[in-house]
């Protein structure tokens, strides 16, 4: 039987992704993932391409969508269609926290257009499990 699966996200640690960038997983499926993304002031999410749509709702802080030259603050919502290529940066003095629901893979793109990293729902889930193992934590049931 299928049923709702509530839990307290405060029980999930922030998992490092890159310099000044961490995530708190909320749910993984074969199609996508839901997570909280945290950016420390000045942190940059490098240029990347989405293979599925993305819904991003700013909970706190301000981030600049670099290619669009737009600032998104608390309560701001951004829809990104499949194929969107973008990067962003935390601006201001406080961390940014964004609730993200995304589908499909995401590829990070280097200065010469090469793919430097590919994330899928499965690889991000593996990152979460590895973090839990390395830190002697019991993984939450997020699938």
Regions found by a protein language model. Name each.
Residues 34, 44-45, 61-65, 77, ...:
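Short beta-strand segments in beta-sandwich/barrel cores
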Residues 69, 82-111:
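Ligand-binding loop in jelly-roll beta-barrel domains
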């Amino acid at each position: 039987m299928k049923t709702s699966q509530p839990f307290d996200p405060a029980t999930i640690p922030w998992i490092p992704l890159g310099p000044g960038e961490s995530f708190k997983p909320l749910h993984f499926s074969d199609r996508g993932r839901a997570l909280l993304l945290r950016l420390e002031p000045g942190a940059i999410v490098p240029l990347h391409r989405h293979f599925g749509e993305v819904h991003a709702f700013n909970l706190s802080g301000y981030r600049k969508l670099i290619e669009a030259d737009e600032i998104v603050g608390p309560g701001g919502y951004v829809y990104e269609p499949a194929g969107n290529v973008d990067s962003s940066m935390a601006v201001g003095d406080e961390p940014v926290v964004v609730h993200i629901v995304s589908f499909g893979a995401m590829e990070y793109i280097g200065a010469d257009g090469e793919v430097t990293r590919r994330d899928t729902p499965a690889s991000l889930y593996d990152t979460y499990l590895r973090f839990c193992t390395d830190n002697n934590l019991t993984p939450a049931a997020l699938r």
